[in-house]
Amino acid sequence: MIASPYPPRLLIVEPNERALGVMAKRFAEAGYRVVACDRPTSAIAELHRQPTDLVVAELRMPGLSGIELVRMVRDDSVLKETPVVLITGRSDASGAIDGFGAGADDVVAKPFDFSVLIARVANRLARARSFRELREDNAALDARVITRAIELGETRAALQASEAELLRLQKMVGRA
C-alpha cells in the first residue's frame, strides 16, 4: 500500500478488456488512482487532459503500438518525463530491446507476478519523484546564485562608490 494522501495516478493502456480490468483492479487495491484505456489514442488524449504519474502499456496494440505510444510521450515537451512501463507477450528479447530503444523506462514480460509489476512501478515512481525534486532543488539553487550575484554586484558598486569618495576626501585633505 502506498503511504500518501495523494496516491500516484496511473494510466493503464491495454486493448484486452479483461486484462485491463484485472490490472486496474490490482493497481487500485495497491493504492493507486487508476485510469484505464483500451485504445492508445484515448490514452494520449487522457495524458493531455490530466497529469499522470506513470503509464503502463501493452507493447502490441492495434492501431498504435506501445512502442509508438512511448515515442509520442518522449517527443512531447509536456509528457516526456512521464515514466512508461511496457508489458510484452514476446518471449524473445526483441520486445524489451525495442521498448528500451523507444525510451520505455521498464519492460515486463508476460507471464509476470503482479507483485513484481507493482514493485517495478513503485520503483519507477520513486525515481521520477527523486528526479523531479532534484530539478526543483537545482532551480531553487540557480535562483539563489543569481540573487546572490546581483547582491554582490550591488555591494561591489557601493564599495567602489565609497572608495571613490574616500580618495576624493584624501585628495582634499592633502591639499589643505
Q: For each of these PLM feature ranges, what is it?
A:
Residues G31-R39, E46:
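Short hydrophobic/Thr-rich beta-strand motif most characteristic of the beta2 strand and flanking loop
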Residues F112-V121, L125:
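C-terminal output helix
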Residues A45, I67-K80:
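Short amphipathic alpha-helix used as the core "switch/output" element in two-component signaling
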Residues D38-R39, S65-E68:
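Acidic catalytic/metal-coordinating carboxylates
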Residues R135-A176:
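C-terminal output/effector regions of signal-responsive regulators
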Residues I2-A19, M23-F27, P40, V55-V56:
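Conserved acidic segment of CheY-like receiver
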Residues E68, S91-D106:
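Alpha4 helix (beta4-alpha4-beta5 surface) of REC/receiver domains from two-component response regulators
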Residues E58, T88:
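Active-site residues of response regulator receiver
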